[in-house]
Amino acid sequence: AAIFLKAAELVAGPYRDKINAATMLAQSKTIFQAEIDAACELVDFLKFNVHSMQHIYSQQPKSEDGVWNRLGYRPLEGFVYAVTPFNFTAISGNLPGSAAMMGNTVVWKPSDHQIFSAKIVIDVFKEAGLPDGVINAVYGDPEMITNTVLDSKHFAGIHFTGSTSVFKGLWKKIGTNIENYNSYPRIVGETGGKDFIVAHNSADTDELSTAVIRGAFEFQGQKCSAASRVYIPKSISKDFFEKLKSEVKKIKMGSPEDFKNFMTAVIHENSFDKLVNAIEKAK
């Protein structure tokens, strides 16, 4: 626990500017989005995980007079495979870190588009005192790495954040290989969402338009929590859409190095092409 509390101190202090800058430059987040993710949320994850671990260990069976009952926890019998996405630097510290905190050896595959800040996360853990070989970052072809990992008899668990389709494929392959493993792997995953906003007819349309714009377009909508649907009562729809269109026209877009920009670039060319196709279909 002390190692990860120290890591939280390092992220909040001497590494704060570096991890924010890496998230801005390599993942194209604005300064605000980088700060609430790479610094604030990562610190929260690290501290909350320590709190949760202490809570788990505190849940002990009763000990009567002359008897001391003690419940201990062992790591999994093998290694944990952590797979993290590009869109949250905090998740890249949380998924491998929480598994390591409970005594597991971790093979960690960061997103190809998040390698810069992932390297800084590793540097933080190392400076905090994490021994070499506990969290092992592996870069390269995702399919090759995953197939190698899931074919190992020592694979004992997966900690995943990413798309629903990829997670289903991983689950299916693990099931196919179940006879080859030394134990039953733990499968933990967080996947995509289709979040929505529901407005009441008493809603303030100024506040509502702001909420929709921020929910849909912050970090270019590249979050599972991004607002993808909005349900508006007919009684306020005209006023709302007029204000929404007016505010959307004011959005500034450009480099994250300009702190006045609200939006920046999407993560890669394929993402851009997908959005262009969706817009063309909508027309």
Feature locations, PLM:
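Conserved small-residue-rich beta-alpha loop and adjacent elements
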Residues: 58-132, 206
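Conserved residues at the C-terminal ends of beta-strands
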Residues: 52, 83, 141, 161
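Long amphipathic alpha-helix in the N-terminal Rossmann-like dinucleotide-binding domain
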Residues: 1-17, 24-57, 67-71
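A structured beta-alpha segment of the ubiquitous adenosine-cofactor-binding alpha/beta core
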Residues: 69-71, 136-159
